[in-house]
UniProtKB/Swiss-Prot annotation:
Lineage: Eukaryota, Metazoa, Chordata, Craniata, Vertebrata
Domain GAF, residue spans: 122-272, 304-461
Keyword Magnesium: yes
Protein name stated in the entry: cGMP-specific 3',5'-cyclic phosphodiesterase
Organism: Rattus norvegicus
Broadest EC class assigned to this enzyme: hydrolase
Biological function: Plays a role in signal transduction by regulating the intracellular concentration of cyclic nucleotides. This phosphodiesterase catalyzes the specific hydrolysis of cGMP to 5'-GMP. Specifically regulates nitric-oxide-generated cGMP.
Amino acid sequence: MLPFGDKTRDMVNAWFSERVHNIPVCKEGIRAHTESCSCSLPQSPHADNTTPGAPARKISASEFDRPLRPIVVKDSEGTVSFLSDSGKKEQMPLTSPRFDSDEGDQCSRLLELVKDISSHLDVTALCHKIFLHIHGLISADRYSLFLVCEDSSKDKFLVSRLFDVAEGSTLEEASNNCIRLEWNKGIVGHVAAFGEPLNIKDAYEDPRFNAEVDQITGYKTQSILCMPIKNHREEVVGVAQAINKKSGNGGTFTEKDEKDFAAYLAFCGIVLHNAQLYETSLLENKRNQVLLDLASLIFEEQQSLEVILKKIAATIISFMQVQKCTIFIVDEDCPDSFSRVFQMEWEEVGKSSEPLTREHDANKINYMYAQYVKNTMEPLNIPDVTKDNRFPWTNENMGHINTHCIRSLLCTPIKNGKKNKVIGVCQLVNKMEEKTGKIKAFNQNDEQFLEAFVIFCGLGIQNTQMYEAVERAMAKQMVTLEVLSYHASAAEEETRELQALAAAVVPSAQTLKITDFSFSDFELSDLETALCTIRMFTDLNLVQNFQMKHEVLCRWILSVKKNYRKNVAYHNWRHAFNTAQCMFAALKAGKIQNKLTDLETLALLIAALSHDLDHRGVNNSYIQRSEHPLAQLYCHSTMEHHHFDQCLMVLNSPGNQILSGLSIEEYKTTLKIIKQAILATDLALYIKRRGEFFELIRKNEFSFEDPLQKELFLAMLMTACDLSAITKPWPIQQRIAELVAAEFFDQGDRERKELNMEPADLMNREKKNKIPSMQVGFIDAICLQLYEALTHVSEDCLPLLDGCRKNRQKWQALADQQEKTLLNGESGQAKRD
């Protein structure tokens, strides 16, 4: 027959294997603490399922597919919080123990106890019941349960969870008395340290016995049966003690008592293990909820560093029960000092408080500790500053320390997001007992919590600093734009000259020939091009319809001209003017104005004149490859977006506001059309959208009444005007082609020199003999079908298509001639060879 203890163990194991799911045990084990516990959560099996550049997935959302409490809840006042009401516990009541001596009844009692263990996680209540069960077997006078704890220095000690449990005693009576025992001192400390049971007949004859407890309680201890409670790794997690055998064997505990005690203590081990796992998970959950609430509180404020520092200090003081919290912000320009210091005391929580500055500093020793932590980048926990001799300034400032009543101190660095730089220091002074207000040392749990909290503090502070930096940058930008707009505006003398000339006489559109699609600007001066532009605005009725002041219009035209770079061969003011002239001709001679609103006409002319503002002589591809700052501003159509921004800058500059006569809605509509029109000059967007337009024309389904189709037409019209040089008479087309080639070759030279890359044939100076064939390819791929579609919409735009076809014939002839010359050259070379 198996011994009672072995039978019990086998029976319990069998019962648990059938009814209880395995509980994963954390790697670092379970340690009971007087205030809280912490434990590393087991790693998810998905942790290694990562992809390059992606964060490691510690856990999958699918693992939470079960009925769980909501993550975000609302309290009674309706405030959103991560903290739930976890105090409500639904548990079955504990059954009362029965004290029968029969072994079969003992097994029944064990099963009854096992059921309680499986459905309850209250360590104190269950262990109290276990002791009452034990009392029925070994009949001792008193029982006590001590749990192993650790302080902030990881020094172990024992604290009573149940003390002096006696027959008839209540749970409240046994759990109210709390006694702390030193490790490896006294009988209990010895058993905890060595993990071996002790059966002592006369306590006062044992040198290990500590009579202080008897002196405190007034109780006389005689015999002691003291046994360790171990977890599954054979680590001592507690000690159970039975005192003074009440009957039989001379008042001493027998070997059978030892076996019975050990058997039932196995249940205590199970209870402690399960309950501590549960308690740890609850504490971890609550701590995470607290951190989430704190993070939410911090990130509510991102605009003012003063406000966020006040929130941080008030939250830490309230939660951690400290007398004073000081937050030091490191000076970026002078890393050895602090730029801002915010200090709050317990009495100031909830009140307005001003940050301390170094000029008003009254406690230099705080700076010394903060400077030390900043330099070492490690936390500092001093239980009693008056007894700490590690730092030379402690003794030098002892009077100062006593004056300000500095005792316990916890100082932690606040690091940036990359954890490689200290951006601040959080310093706590004098932790208080929650009930008495007595000053005590910070423990390991305080260190861990503050370490976690300053991570959120660091993010909050860094984000706020970034916001302040952005605000300063925006302020600087506004000043820069103000200066830029001043210098971007035309000179007053030039404006007055144009205004006077325009007031005297502006030739008619027929005289200036600006309604002709074959128009050439080569014989005009810059001032004459400005006069032509005034005539365009006048003949389109824009000056009259939108109450434009003559002086403002003159200044705006000259300012637009000024903001085109003179060192760019082709994409300069003359190209913008020619684009606007083609737009004017299409609107007037092409009779397209009749199909548009006044706002659309206004927007198209402004867009045509502004569509290449501040062009740098390079295309979008070069901007992207060279990693120009402009490439960081826009994800596509980089230069076109920049042209629109420059257009806005000129339009909003003082003295250039030609749209001031528009209502707010008209102004918004006009800017929207201008933006769409300027972006439409990006050939990449044209190629992307032209298929839809050509299909509408092919099916004869295009209608100006459809807003989307009309918007698409305006985009195509902008491209047609932008490329109109390809439709000019052959002499003009040749000269413009030379300008375009010069600009492209300059970009190719820069690509070869700056980017160390071989340019495309279009940009390659060494391939200039291919210009005719490339022009033919450009006309076929980009231009012909566009002008055919435009002519289908308005037959009066036929000159554009005719000019394009004629120039194609000219370029094809040159290409054929060059190919023939090349073949003849190769043939002659072959004959000579």
